[in-house]
């Protein structure tokens, strides 16, 4: 009853099963932006980041127009990955490679990013690599052992949030977070 840690789609929460979907081909049209980003000098050029929740925009076109009008260089989007419930909020991620279905499909997210890139705007996807929520369907004791969390119980739980702390000493955890 665990969600596939590398799954790219899930049922609509609160259900948590991974869903196998056809990997539709997406035709990116952001080549100009991708080339420009190679020349970007982060320490020498001004950056202006608009942080926003996907839930704040009913229509992604409104977000693109707003960002363009105010000349933001980048947008930081959250929540992006699938999370279990509204009580945990967007930081209760249980499917790190699956875009949340609450705001559309994976194709919708790609389209939004593509449109932002086409107006010259970079995109940051906000996520939490520091800790993960405590729930049976997720990474917690994934194979019956502390596979992702710190095996030392005194170092496994974040004292303020009550979430599991990743075991950064594990090569598997590093690979998972960097994949």
Locations of regions flagged by a protein language model:
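The feature marks proteins involved in alpha-glucan
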Residues: 1-49
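Substrate-binding/active-site clefts of carbohydrate-active enzymes
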Residues: 31, 38-44, 53-58, 62-179
């Amino acid at each position: 009853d665990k969600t596939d840690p590398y799954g790219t789609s899930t049922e609509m929460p609160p259900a948590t099963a991974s869903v196998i979907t056809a990997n539709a081909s997406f035709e990116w049209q952001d080549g100009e932006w991708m080339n420009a980003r190679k020349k970007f000098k982060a320490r020498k050029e001004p950056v202006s980041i608009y942080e926003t929740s996907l839930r704040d925009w009913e229509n992604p076109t409104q977000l693109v127009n707003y960002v363009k009008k105010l000349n933001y260089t980048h947008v930081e989007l959250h929540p992006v990955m699938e999370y279990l419930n509204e009580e945990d909020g967007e930081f209760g991620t249980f499917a790190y490679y699956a875009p949340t279905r609450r705001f559309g499909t994976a194709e919708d997210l790609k389209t939004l990013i593509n449109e932002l890139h086409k107006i010259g705007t970079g995109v940051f996807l906000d996520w939490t690599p520091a800790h993960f929520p405590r729930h049976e369907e997720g990474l917690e004791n994934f194979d019956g052992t502390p596979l992702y969390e710190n095996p030392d119980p005194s170092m496994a739980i974040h004292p303020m949030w009550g979430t599991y702390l990743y075991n950064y000493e594990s090569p598997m955890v590093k690979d998972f977070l960097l994949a």
